[in-house]
Amino acid sequence: MNDKLELKNNLKEMRMEKKLSQAALADLVGVSRNTISSIETGQFNPTAKLALLLCIALDKKFEDIFYF
């Protein structure tokens, strides 16, 4: 039985709502623009620390950005 949960996100929508570019958000949380792009496209799941930093930078709750 393969019940692997896949973390999905609304990061792009939340970022655009704040009128931030990928590069600007990346600078705010201390990662590369490529990392933000990879999270937005589901190619990379952020660590708990990075997810928290993204929530703080976007002034959103975890469940507003990330879901299963």
Task: Give residue spans per PLM region.
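Short alpha-helical DNA-recognition segment
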Residues: K19-T35
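Central "turn" residue of the DNA-binding helix-turn-helix
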Residues: K19, G30, T41-G42, D59
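Alpha-helical residues within the helix-turn-helix
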Residues: M16, D27, I56
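Short, charged recognition helix plus adjacent turn
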Residues: M1, D64-F68
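DNA major-groove recognition helix of helix-turn-helix/homeodomain DNA-binding modules
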Residues: K49-D64
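Conserved hydrophobic/aromatic packing and binding residues within compact polymer-binding modules
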Residues: L11, L25-A26, I36-I39, I65
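A short, Lys/Arg-rich alpha-helix, primarily the initiator
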Residues: M1-E17
